[in-house]
Curated annotation (Swiss-Prot):
Native source species: Paracoccus denitrificans (strain Pd 1222)
Gene Ontology MF annotations: 2-methoxy-6-polyprenyl-1,4-benzoquinol methyltransferase activity; demethylmenaquinone methyltransferase activity
Keywords annotated in UniProt: Menaquinone biosynthesis, Methyltransferase, S-adenosyl-L-methionine, Transferase, Ubiquinone biosynthesis
Superkingdom of the organism of origin: Bacteria
Chain's role: Methyltransferase required for the conversion of demethylmenaquinol (DMKH2) to menaquinol (MKH2) and the conversion of 2-polyprenyl-6-methoxy-1,4-benzoquinol (DDMQH2) to 2-polyprenyl-3-methyl-6-methoxy-1,4-benzoquinol (DMQH2).
PROSITE patterns, A to Z: SAM_MT_UBIE, UBIE_1, UBIE_2
Name of the protein this chain belongs to: Ubiquinone/menaquinone biosynthesis C-methyltransferase UbiE
Amino acid sequence: MTPDEPKETHFGFRTVAEKDKAGLVHGVFSRVASRYDVMNDLMSGGVHRIWKTAMMDWLAPRDGQHLLDVAGGTGDIAFRFLDRAPGARVTVCDMTESMLVEGRKRAEAGKQADRLAWVTGDAMALPFADDSFDRYTISFGIRNVTRIPDALAEARRVLRPGGRLMVLEFSQMPVPMLQWLYDRYSFNVIPVMGQIVANDRDSYQYLVESIRKFPDQETFATMIREAGFGRVQWRNLSMGIAALHSGWKL
């Protein structure tokens, strides 16, 4: 590739120009926003709720903390954080306005709206000052980012010294036979489910493919370290179908 040629990345299994990926991802989540939470329950059999509980257990929210939840549109992580720490605050940042609309609806139906802020923004260029937040979370979102190292660098920038990053993302199973079975379910069932429930097979085909393009647990941990985080650790969930990664701005 010459300096004048456009840089390329992946969109699921497709190769696309870097400049086009964000728009393609935005299109996916704009289309699925209204059915996003329902599909999470159906695709995982509700297990995503257990994973998010494990995330909160490890994150240990405290009153007075300010959380930035990136790619958090419908507010699932934000609401869980505030349930654990009623005296905390959460800013939810998402590039897709229609996802934020769904989150605001949920907030207005509850009692947490005054502790929540909703901001449209890009994980690779966050619209916040340095050292603004105590905690940064991103749940099932970082694999959709065009340049993951840029998003991790931004996470570190906006965290205060002593702040903590936590990522919940699909990952790789260490047992080949289990991975094979999981792949069969993912490729044969989830897109069909997306068509039936959300009338959108293609978006869920992309989501399945994007999981396979995301790095394994140790490779991603190395990326977090290279972004400048310390005390980096990871934990498998459901035998590696998903994983939690934690790092600190020291």
